[in-house]
Regions:
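A charged helix-plus-loop insertion that forms the helical arch/lid used to bind
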Residues: 88-98
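ATP-binding/phosphotransfer module of carbohydrate and carboxylate kinases, centering on a glycine-rich
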Residues: 1-74, 84-89, 106-114, 128-138, ...
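Adenylate-forming
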Residues: 125-131, 151-154, 173-174
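A short acidic Gly-Thr/Ser loop motif
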Residues: 14-19, 145-149, 167
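Short, intrinsically disordered, charge-biased short linear motifs at domain edges
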Residues: 168-176
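General beta-strand structural signal in soluble alpha/beta enzymes
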Residues: 116-120, 154
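Short beta-strand scaffold segments in enzyme catalytic cores
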Residues: 21-25, 150-155
Length: 335
C-alpha cells in the first residue's frame, strides 16, 4: 500500500472457493489493508460448517487488519457455481457439492450481523481488475479465469453483466464443438472449458501420450505428476507434444476471445488464474490466433493482457461490489 494512510470507509471481501476461502479488507480506493492466509472451506462437512468458515474468515480479516467491525461499511461475497444473484441463492454449485438451493447471502449475513452483497466469483474478480487492476483505465472488459474450470466476468460500460438469470458471463461454456465434443464439468459437451481449462489440458495430454510414447510427458504421466504446469515446463524445454498441446490451448482461448469481441466488443480482454504462469509466450500465442477468428478492427484494437491482481482479485472485487452498494446502488457501479 505504500506510505499513504488507508482511506476510509473500509470494505470486507470474501472469496469462496471449492477448497479454500480467501478474505481481505480494502479501503475506499481499493488498496489492500490486510488479507488472511486462506482457510479450508471444508465442503464435505456441509454448508453449515462452510458458512461458519466464511464468517470466521471475514472476522479474522477484520481483526488482523487492526480495524474494528464497526469500521466495516460493507461486506461482499464472491462464490462459484450456478446461482440466483438477486435472490442470494446458490442453486447447484459443482464445486460445492451438497450446498444446493442455499440462501447463502442471508445465512452469512445472519452470522456476521451485517448485510452481504452477493456476486459470482468470476464477476467479482473481473470487477476487481476493472476497479484497481489491469483494467482500471478502460470502460469495458472481459476476464477469463483459467484454472480447474474457466470462469468469466464481464464489465460493460462500468457495469457487471449478470444477465436475466445470473448466467450473463458464463463464457467458459461457449460452445466450440457442436457434435461429439468433449464433456464439460457441467455435464454438457463441446464447451470451451472442456478444451482449454487446466483440467482439460491435462486430460488432452493424457490421451495424446498414448500416441507419443517418446514424449517427456509420458514419463511425467507415469510418475503421476502430470499437470498443466508440468506440460508448460515441458513445452518450454522443447518437447514437441507439450508444445502442440499448449499451442492448441492458445487457439481454443483465441476462439473464446474472438467470440466475446463479436458480442461484447470490449476495450480489454484479460486472462487470469493459475494457467497464466505459462507466461508471455502463451499470451502471445493467444494473440497470434485471434486475427483468424475475429473481425479486423476488434482483432487489431482490442487489448489482450494478463490480469494484474493475482489471487487477490476475488476478494478485492467482492469488496468493491460492497462499496458500490454502499455508495450508490449495485446497478450503477463506479470506480
Amino acid at each position: 500500500m505504500g506510505t499513504e494512510e488507508p482511506q476510509p470507509p473500509f470494505f470486507l471481501g470474501i472469496d469462496l472457493g471449492g477448497t479454500q476461502i480467501k478474505a481481505g479488507v480494502v479501503d475506499d480506493r481499493g488498496r489492500k489493508v490486510h488479507a488472511i492466509d486462506p482457510i479450508p472451506t471444508e465442503v464435505p462437512r456441509g454448508p453449515e460448517v462452510g458458512l461458519d468458515n466464511l464468517a470466521r474468515a471475514g472476522r479474522l480479516a477484520v481483526e488482523q487488519s487492526g480495524l474494528k467491525w464497526e469500521d466495516i461499511a460493507g461486506v461482499g461475497l464472491g462464490s462459484p457455481g450456478t446461482m440466483d444473484i438477486r435472490a442470494g441463492l446458490l442453486l447447484d454449485p459443482v464445486n460445492l457439492q451438497g450446498w444446493n438451493n442455499l440462501p447463502i447471502r442471508q445465512r452469512l449475513s445472519e452470522r456476521l450481523g451485517q448485510s452481504v452483497v452477493f456476486q459470482n466469483d468470476a464477476n467479482a474478480a473481473a470487477y476487481g481488475e476493472y476497479w484497481v487492476g489491469a483494467g482500471r483505465d478502460v470502460r469495458s472488459l472481459v476476464m477469463f479465469t483459467l484454472g480447474t474450470g474457466i470462469g468469466c466476468g464481464i464489465i460493460d460500460e462500468g457495469r457487471i453483466v449478470e444477465g436475466r438469470h445470473s448466467h450473463g458471463a458464463e463464457c467458459g461454456h461457449i460452445i466450440i464443438q457442436m457434435d461429439g465434443g468433449r464433456t464439460c464439468s457441467c455435464g454438457m459437451t463441446g464447451h470451451l472449458e472442456a478444451y482449454a481449462s487446466a483440467t482439460a489440458l491435462v486430460k488432452r495430454a493424457a490421451e495424446a501420450i498414448e500416441g507419443s510414447p517418446g514424449s517427456v510427458l509420458a514419463e511425467i504421466h507415469a510418475q503421476g505428476k502430470l499437470s498443466s504446469k508440468a506440460i508448460d515446463q515441458a513445452a518450454e524445454a522443447g518437447d514437441a507434444l507439450a508444445t502442440r498441446l499448449m499451442d492448441e490451448t492458445a487457439r481454443y482461448l483465441a476462439v473464446g476471445a474472438a467470440t466475446l469481441m463479436h458480442t461484447i466488443d470490449p476495450d480489454l480482454i484479460l486472462f487470469g488464474g493459475g494457467m497464466i504462469a505459462a507466461g508471455a509466450k502463451f499470451l502471445d500465442a493467444i494473440r497470434s490466433y485471434i486475427p483468424r477468428y475475429a473481425f479486423p478492427i476488434p482483432a487489431r484494437e482490442t487489448r489482450v493482457e494478463f490480469a494484474g491482481l493475482g489471487e487477490d482479485a476475488g476478494f478485492i472485487g467482492a469488496a468493491g461490489c460492497a462499496r458500490i452498494a454502499h455508495r450508490v446502488s449495485f446497478s450503477h457501479p463506479d470506480r
